[in-house]
Amino acid sequence: SLWFFDKNKRAENRDKVLFIDARNYYTVVDRTLNEWTEWQLRNLQAIVHLYRGETEKYQALLNDYRQVLGDITVASAQATLDKQKTEAKEAIANASRKDKKRIEAEMKAIEDALEDTLETARQYEWLTEKFGEGEYKDVLGLCKIATIQEIEEKNYSLTPGAYVGVAEAEDDGVDFHERMSEIHAELKRLNEEANVLMGEILKGW
């Protein structure tokens, strides 16, 4: 849980409380660990800034995004990453045995950097799609400004989900069957490579 205490509330925020439900806004680290990235934490804080009328702080965050991204969008970052992955596979496939590990490491470093850029673009898009250039609004499933009367009607519950509601499920644009086919193809390729490697190892005995 995140708590933001406001000792100097604006008059229009008297007897009101901002609730943010960030349960569905996180980055998966592994099967048992989720976390907020730096950009995600700053986005959550930006919602608080807008609630408090601190639009200059929201604008400062947008400027930070734009300095990092320039003209890069989610679409262009994804296209660049996909192109790099294709080129990396070709480079690794054509590399000599001696150079393969070095090229794999170089390609991975490039892909990691592109992944970071793509994630930054996604967080910028997430923020601006909801709040544009800096105007607070209640967002279903994410945030809501509730009055003391509304809180009283809910028996003074301080659970954000009781106020923000449930957002509609978003279509991530990924075709499940197509993705499963890709995974099976990748597993088949890895299995074939493992068999070849095992054959080479056995030859040395």
Predicted regions and their residues:
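A conserved structural/catalytic subdomain of Rossmann-like adenosyl-cofactor enzymes
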Residues: S1-G204
